[in-house]
């Protein structure tokens, strides 16, 4: 019988600290630079990793502090996708949320400059020896089966199979890139 390598203590997403929310708002209003925003984010990630390790976790995440959504930021930054404003907002526990979504706008591919790579490299740099830093990304099913995100595939692909092949390759190449950066735990949500 094989032994399970990890015990799963958390998904990886944490509530965003108030300091991060405020820094994001200042960035959106042009009051601070992206570099200043990342400085705040990095300090909070460092504190979170310390807290995770202090509480006995052997696998740590960056809390997804670099994201505004748990899934959309990743997709917006793949080649061949764009953000847009949909008519209706998401519904979550009866509350309305933002109306931002994602849709196809070209051939799909890995983005070698994806900001999640930078975030992982920072996470890895503040993760103590013997602790595993993990990456979380949304599964490709969020493109295929949700919110009409794949409806425009025929504008860019000759067939559904060609679209799926490129989507699979984009994920493969992205995960390989994370691996090349030292990631040994990539979680698809």
Model region roles, listed by residue range:
Residues 1-189:
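Domain-level signal for soluble alpha/beta catalytic cores
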